[in-house]
From Swiss-Prot:
Entries under InterPro entries matching the protein: Met_Sox_Rdtase_MsrB, Met_Sox_Rdtase_MsrB_dom, Mss4-like_sf
EC number: 1.8.4.12
Catalytic activity, reaction form: L-methionyl-[protein] + [thioredoxin]-disulfide + H2O = L-methionyl-(R)-S-oxide-[protein] + [thioredoxin]-dithiol
Keyword presence, Cell cycle: no
Alphabetically ordered keywords of this record: Metal-binding, Oxidoreductase, Zinc
Catalytic residues (UniProt): C118
This protein's name: Peptide methionine sulfoxide reductase MsrB
Cofactor binding note: Binds 1 zinc ion per subunit. The zinc ion is important for the structural integrity of the protein.
Matches recorded under Gene3D superfamilies: Peptide methionine sulfoxide reductase
PROSITE patterns, sorted: MSRB
Residues in MsrB domain copies: 7-129
Length: 137
C-alpha cells in the first residue's frame, strides 16, 4: 500500500462527502455524484492517490445511481474485501494502491465480464483524454 496522507491532511483537502466515502466506507446518495453522467473519453483515478482505476470505455449506465464500470484497468488496481454489513453479503472494492473505499462490485454487469463495479463519484478523479482536464467527483 502506498503512503497516504494523514487523516488531518485529508480532512483539510477533501469535501465532507469525499472524506466520508473514501475513509469511512460511506456511500454518497444515488444520482448525486458529479461523475455519474460524464461521457467524456479518459481515465478515472483514485481521488486519494491518483492511481488509475477505470477507463471510460468500460463505463456504462446501469441505472443504479452511481458510476458503473464492467472492468478495472488492471487486477492490481482494485482490492476486494468481503462486506457483511447491513445484513447482506457484498464485495467491497478499495483502491489497490492506497486502500481508499470506492464502492462495491456485483455479478450483474454486462459482458464481457458480467461484473458491475458500482463506484462512488466522491472517490474518483476523472482525467479527460483529450485536454487533460481533471474533475474531482
Amino acid at each position: 500500500m502506498a503512503n497516504k496522507p494523514s487523516a488531518e491532511e485529508l480532512k483539510k483537502n477533501l469535501s465532507d462527502m469525499q472524506f466520508y466515502v473514501t475513509q469511512n466506507h460511506g456511500t454518497e446518495p444515488p444520482f448525486t455524484g458529479r461523475l455519474l453522467h460524464n461521457k467524456r473519453d479518459g481515465v478515472y483515478h483514485c481521488l486519494i492517490c491518483d492511481a488509475p482505476l477505470f477507463h471510460s470505455q468500460t463505463k456504462y449506465d446501469s441505472g443504479c445511481g452511481w458510476p458503473s464500470f464492467y472492468e478495472p484497468v488492471s487486477e492490481e488496481s482494485i482490492r476486494y474485501i468481503k462486506d457483511l454489513s447491513h445484513g447482506v453479503q457484498r464485495i467491497e472494492i478499495r483502491c489497490g494502491n492506497c486502500d481508499a473505499h470506492l464502492g462495491h462490485v456485483f455479478p450483474d454487469g454486462p459482458q464481457p465480464t458480467g461484473e458491475r463495479y458500482c463506484v462512488n463519484s466522491a472517490s474518483l478523479r476523472f482525467t479527460d483524454g483529450e485536454n487533460g482536464e481533471e474533475i474531482n467527483g
